[in-house]
């Protein structure tokens, strides 16, 4: 007949938990974790984990990582990078100074051309612009400013 509870549930509240008196179910006879991989567990490591120990090849000392790191933002998300107040002010006085959106400060490097911009001029600062993004920004009377 199948038991409803697992053995561990039945043993709750019993100090020895089925392992006899003090010290009978010994603590960590082979060491903890991966201990002894080069010594008493050598056979297991050699058989099932070949190449676990040791090094191969040479190190590349001056390797530049993340050279191609270039987070992008699309035009349809451009206005979400500025505050609500800036958006309202820009919509009110269309003849005044165009608002400046610095995408680098928001963590983006490149502006891509997906989506539409509202018909009001805006100055966008970024490290890179796609061709279509530049066309669309200039199409609404804005400007693209390259920053280092």
Swiss-Prot record:
The modification Phosphoserine is found at residue 68. It is found in: Cytoplasm. It comes from the Eukaryota. The modification N6-acetyllysine is found at residues 47, 55, 110. GO terms for biological process: translation. The modification (3S)-3-hydroxyhistidine is found at residue 39. PROSITE patterns: RIBOSOMAL_L15. Coiled coil: none annotated. Residues 1-30 have a biased composition (Basic residues). Component of the large ribosomal subunit. Belongs to the universal ribosomal protein uL15 family. This is Large ribosomal subunit protein uL15. It comes from Macaca fascicularis (Crab-eating macaque). The lineage of its organism: Eukaryota, Metazoa, Chordata, Craniata, Vertebrata.
């Amino acid at each position: 007949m199948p038991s409803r509870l697992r053995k561990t549930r039945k043993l709750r509240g019993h100090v020895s938990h089925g392992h006899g008196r003090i010290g009978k179910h010994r603590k960590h006879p082979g060491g903890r974790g991966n201990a002894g991989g080069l010594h008493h567990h050598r056979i297991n490591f050699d058989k099932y984990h070949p190449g676990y120990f040791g090094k191969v090849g040479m190190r590349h000392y001056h390797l530049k990582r993340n050279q191609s790191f270039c987070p992008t933002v699309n035009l349809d998300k451009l206005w979400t990078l500025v505050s609500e107040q800036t958006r309202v002010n820009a919509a009110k006085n269309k003849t005044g100074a165009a608002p400046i959106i610095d995408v680098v400060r928001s963590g983006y490097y490149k502006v891509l051309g997906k989506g539409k911009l509202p018909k009001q001029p805006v100055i966008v600062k970024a490290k890179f612009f796609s061709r279509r993004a530049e066309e669309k920004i200039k199409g609404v009377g804005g400007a693209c400013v390259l920053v280092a």
